[in-house]
């Protein structure tokens, strides 16, 4: 059985900021491509969410075409993936999301 996905407010804000950035500095096509890439990564996580553990119980899934990492945790008992943040890897590591 696949996991359900719960996206945090911080992650939603991260995604909105990335889309706004790509709309402003590139094109709407690039912004749509970012959203498509994010959704594709989430779909890849759902059937098998056991990616690399980054910190404590937080896992990471790097995006391929964009410099972002998806941070998430698992509730294995209830089969829920909690997406905590979508972090731009071009920012300094000091700015990593406070998990």
Name what the model sees in each region.
Residues 39-40, 48-80:
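Basic/aromatic recognition patch in beta-strand/loop cores that engages polyanionic ligands
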Residues 73-99:
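Enriched for short, Lys/Arg-rich terminal
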Residues 1-57:
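Basic, Lys/Arg-enriched alpha-helical interface segments
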